[in-house]
From Swiss-Prot:
Belongs to the class-II aminoacyl-tRNA synthetase family. Its main location: cytoplasm. Its EC number is 6.1.1.21. It comes from the Bacteria. GO terms for biological process: histidyl-tRNA aminoacylation. It comes from Limosilactobacillus fermentum (strain NBRC 3956 / LMG 18251) (Lactobacillus fermentum). The keyword Ligase applies. This is Histidine--tRNA ligase. Homodimer. CDD domains: HisRS-like_core, HisRS_anticodon.
Amino acid sequence: MRYQRPKGTADILPGDSQTWQYVEGQARQIFKTYGYQEIRTPLFESYDIFSRSAGDTSDVVTKEMYDFKDKGDRHIALRPEGTAGVVRAFVENKLYGPEFNKPYKVYYIGPMFRYERPQSGRQREFHQIGVEAFGADNPAVDVEVITMALRFFKKLGLSDLRVAVNSLGDQESRANYRQALIDYLKPHYDELSEDSKERLEKNPLRVLDSKDERDQQFVENAPSILDYLTPAAAERFDQVKEMLDSLGIDYVVDATMVRGLDYYNHTIFEVMVKAKSLGHGYTTICGGGRYSGLVEELGGPDEPGVGFGIGLERLILLLGDEGVELPTEDGLDVYVVGIGEATNLESFRLVTAARDAGLVAERDYLNRKPKAQFKTAAKEGAKVTLTVGQREIEEGTVHFKVMATGKEVSVPLADCLADFGKVYQEHVEEG
């Protein structure tokens, strides 16, 4: 039987993993400058963590989650997004305590799981980079996470990004808007999609998130939530826009944007880009916002939070589509060519000495002919080849060749084994 990877998953092979490592490394560097530290949470959590946080009417919970009963009859779900697990960890470990600085800033990088139709940039197992900041209600933190995302994308070489912002207001704002939306949609009930009919009863804001063509005309003409913000919520949103303006960030206000998860309130945002690899029109590559009630919903104190998530698959597709050239790792420093089985021990000692000196080194393990070994050394971009055969062993020497200059020299084997770094520096770095 020939086994294949599950549908909607991918093998990230060594030729591609280098790109992933670079992108993740840039994220870590950027986040560090903003005071964020890494957090790692389980790949699976209690089902209730996600149903309570994402909302039991959201597509994530009703259609996309991988959930099951384990052998202890516990209802478990593979994480479909990162925020809920981080909030659970924040509450369980009492990271809101007075001994911790506020805002408490963390980031995560890892796989998520959603059962949806696989397509370009969208898999059933996908990877996400995300940040969360807890304990500060200041709208400046909202703007900070937006600017941090933009700084990350620009560091990778992306430009012409579109930022969309909206406010979902406070609890009173949403209650007022909820009723206005129900009053607007009720007369069109029979014309809505089946999903939107159900959403209208349970969470009418979800209708605005519908991608069904039957709902689009009603979404476009729906009342704006911005007209229902309380004075305090409107003032807060004005502060966010003022700070974005002061930083020269190009943005648009999208009053129909609600995001796909129920825990957001006040500021929400998306960073979008237009690229062939991700379909027609603008595609979201980063989304997030504020969630002032989520910590309390999961059993903690009334602590505000704000964050975002970035899809790694989509981002890496985009980088390739835009022709962004990412740095590549250097090849080998040293390749040891051993001629004949009798050189096995000395080849091993030489490659070990090179690695002990902090160099990237490799050798032949297949007892191939010298020509094949030199071909491998060239393919791997080796800066130096060391050749050791029966004659070199008898003479106590090693044939040392600098590939870039063609310089060749015979070096005492004992010197290489005693201090390979010194020999390498003498013949390569000093010419």
